[in-house]
Structure formats: structure tokens, C-alpha cells
Regions:
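C-terminal accessory helical subdomains adjacent to catalytic cores in phosphodiester-
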Residues: 4-134
Length: 134
């Protein structure tokens, strides 16, 4: 699991994805994990993601303790995303986050230039019971 904004250059990100893809399941948030957290809130794509698309994608540092995305999450939730104190507030919103994620980019290569996440896809895969396929 990693954040796309860990790579400054698009080419470095794509090179990493090409190397890692193999049999692994790559879980990516673009620009960062705070996007996934924001998706736990009602109408998050329309209220928070779309209006802030460019600023979110760039995700620049806006203070000594926040990037744009972490500050946005803090404003929405009243919690610092690095503290973990938000977990109980968000755990009931996982299904909402999964559904909202589906309107964003889920292709990990396209996330080099688009806002997206495939965390929900991983959760859905983890929820599947392999015995159902027998």
C-alpha cells in the first residue's frame, strides 16, 4: 500500500508500478491515504474532491503539520489524520467510502495523473469468501 504522492515524477511512479505489479495486489491512493478517509463522509466526491481536484492532486504542504489533503480531512473530521483518533468515527462509513471511490479513478497506472483510490477494491476482495467459489 502506498501513496502516489510518494513519487515526485510521473515516470518514477509508473516504473515502480511496473516492477511491483506481478502477482501482488497494489493498493494505491492518489494523491494520498487522506483521500480514502475523506470518502467516508456523505457526498464527499461532490463536496470535497471535485471542488478541490487540482489542489488535492498537487497535495502541497500548507503548514508545518499538514498537506492540503490532511488539512482538508482535519477540517471535515475535526481530527488529525496522523493521530488515528478518527477510526471509531469512520468505521461505520466503509461501505459509503467503497461506493464513492468507484466514481474516481481505480486504474493504478492512470492514478499517475488522476485522483483515485483502489482501497475499496481491496476491501471487497478481502470480504469475499473463497469457499463460495468451490
Amino acid at each position: 500500500f502506498f501513496d502516489r504522492d510518494s513519487y515526485e515524477k510521473t515516470e518514477d511512479y509508473i516504473e515502480f508500478v511496473d516492477k511491483a505489479i506481478g502477482d501482488n495486489i497494489l493498493t494505491v491512493t492518489s494523491p494520498c491515504f487522506e483521500l480514502w478517509l475523506i470518502l467516508h463522509y456523505e457526498a464527499a466526491v461532490g463536496k470535497y474532491v471535485v471542488p478541490n481536484k487540482d489542489m488535492l492532486f498537487q497535495n502541497e504542504k500548507v503548514s508545518s503539520s499538514h498537506t492540503f489533503a490532511s488539512r482538508l480531512f482535519s477540517e471535515i473530521s475535526g481530527s488529525n489524520p496522523k493521530s488515528g483518533s478518527f477510526f471509531n468515527k469512520l468505521k461505520g462509513g466503509i461501505d459509503l467510502a467503497i461506493e464513492q471511490e468507484k466514481v474516481l479513478e481505480q486504474d493504478i497506472l492512470k492514478m499517475a495523473t488522476e485522483i483515485g483510490s483502489n482501497v475499496g477494491a481491496l476491501i471487497e476482495q478481502m470480504r469475499e469468501d473463497p469457499r463460495d467459489e468451490l
